[in-house]
Amino acid sequence: MQLTSDPRRADRERRYKPPPSTTAPAEDLTTDYMNILGMVFSMCGLMMRLKWCAWTAVFCSSISFANSRVSDDTKQIVSSFMLSISAVVMSYLQNPSPMSPPWATLTT
């Protein structure tokens, strides 16, 4: 069974026009927040010799690196990552004993 007539109506066809965008898409600031948190925790880990701060800085820096876009400033992200790695290395060079959780000092 073959239809020879086209069931569509040519006079009812309209070309699609996307609606005009009045607002810019919201920026995701997770990368910036994690970058700042990573730097703060890195400095706390370096200055106060807190290993858990240094490890939290590595965690925040890797989240910042994972969520970064190609257009983001890579120098800032890499420097934050290197600062957090150096905080971990320096905290373990000063005291090579395993890390104790922060709440362990509250019970003694």
Swiss-Prot record:
Pfam families: ASTER. The keyword Membrane applies. It comes from Manduca sexta (Tobacco hawkmoth). GO terms for biological process: protein insertion into ER membrane. It comes from the Eukaryota. PANTHER family: CGI-140, PAT COMPLEX SUBUNIT ASTERIX. Its main location: membrane. InterPro entries: ASTER. One of its GO terms (molecular function) is protein folding chaperone. The chain crosses the membrane at residues 77-93. GO terms for cellular component: endoplasmic reticulum membrane. This is Protein Asterix. Signal peptide: none annotated. It is found in: Membrane. Keywords: Membrane, Transmembrane, Transmembrane helix. Residues 1-27 are annotated as: Disordered. Belongs to the Asterix family. It is a single-pass membrane protein. Residues 1-16 have a biased composition (Basic and acidic residues).
